[in-house]
Amino acid sequence: MKALHFGAGNIGRGFIGKLLADAGIQLTFADVNQVVLDALNARHSYQVHVVGETEQVDTVSGVNAVSSIGDDVVDLIAQVDLVTTAVGPVVLERIAPAIAKGQVKRKEQGNESPLNIIACENMVRGTTQLKGHVMNALPEDAKAWVEEHVGFVDSAVDRIVPPSASATNDPLEVTVETFSEWIVDKTQFKGALPNIPGMELTDNLMAFVERKLFTLNTGHAITAYLGKLAGHQTIRDAILDEKIRAVVKGAMEESGAVLIKRYGFDADKHAAYIQKILGRFENPYLKDDVERVGRQPLRKLSAGDRLIKPLLGTLEYGLPHKNLIEGIAAAMHFRSEDDPQAQELAALIADKGPQAALAQISGLDANSEVVSEAVTAYKAMQ
């Protein structure tokens, strides 16, 4: 089996690319970073530090790389069985034209073996969004052929991969946590379902997408925002602060109550999942900076994201949300000189006041009780 993976960054190399290569799949990375491409093509291998209770170093080998702009990547798309991405949500639109060209070439060459495409991004139904961009880039006469022969498979991904300060300055070395979860929608594949260790198949993807968003992402963000306010440097420092831990755990329990009501998750298993995530935040090997995790607060405070979406669920089912409100208030306080969204947030609050600003960012009704609760919590933190 042959695969092409867009994005040879830390997540591409440390998570998805590693799982594919470990499964014995012939893997080529596509990227724009020439330093990384040259290193991959010189060595065809790299090291991954897997850190948890213990630390181990795995070697990923037998990999190649091509530029994601140019003819080589188009040629590969015409040949491979699987295309995956870890490029970040905003970059999906930029790689769509190359994917479209590759599919046209595939059709011209008469290659009717199924191709499956899986976007492994921190977003809901990212592959469906990528499909929209690809379809827009396709000529009309290729669209029906692509619908028939190409599967666009949505997925949920979860593995903490912090930017690694490599002691050796090796551009390929990467550190990842032991935990990893890659869940894909088995109803969207064309052809036989792949057997890749570390990839889980489900016919109820949205339950797992929301479980991750409402637990890991919600907890991670609130840990970062409360940690930054309290003067902590890393996620580990913040979660070891008992006051912060109580709010983070409480918020994950509140969002968890929504999941249990909505999808019928087992309450005991979900409580264990929350404990596992708290343990991941404590990982001493992951130097996960609160400022990195907190960046882009406008996106994180938007209606469909990790803070407001679970809050809306608590309103829908009439459930408590005191700790989620604390997290939202802390997010409104997030300041970072390196993050344009943090600066925009500060300017918006200074200009309109916290009530109107939160309503504008989140889509919540400015006069609602929940916005008033958030503003009260926000002011109490000043």
From Swiss-Prot:
GO CC entries: cytosol
The protein's Enzyme Commission number: 1.1.1.17
Gene Ontology BP term (one): mannitol catabolic process
Domain of life from the UniProt record: Bacteria
Annotated positions binding NAD(+): A3, L4, H5, F6, G7, A8, G9, N10, I11, G12, R13, G14
Single GO molecular function: mannitol-1-phosphate 5-dehydrogenase activity
Residues modified as N6-acetyllysine: K269
A Pfam family assignment: Mannitol_dh
Keyword annotations from UniProtKB, A to Z: Acetylation, NAD, Oxidoreductase
Reactions mediated catalytically: D-mannitol 1-phosphate + NAD(+) = beta-D-fructose 6-phosphate + NADH + H(+)
Subunit structure: Monomer.
Similarity annotation: Belongs to the mannitol dehydrogenase family.
Protein name (record): Mannitol-1-phosphate 5-dehydrogenase
Species of origin: Escherichia coli (strain K12)
Designated gene of the protein: mtlD
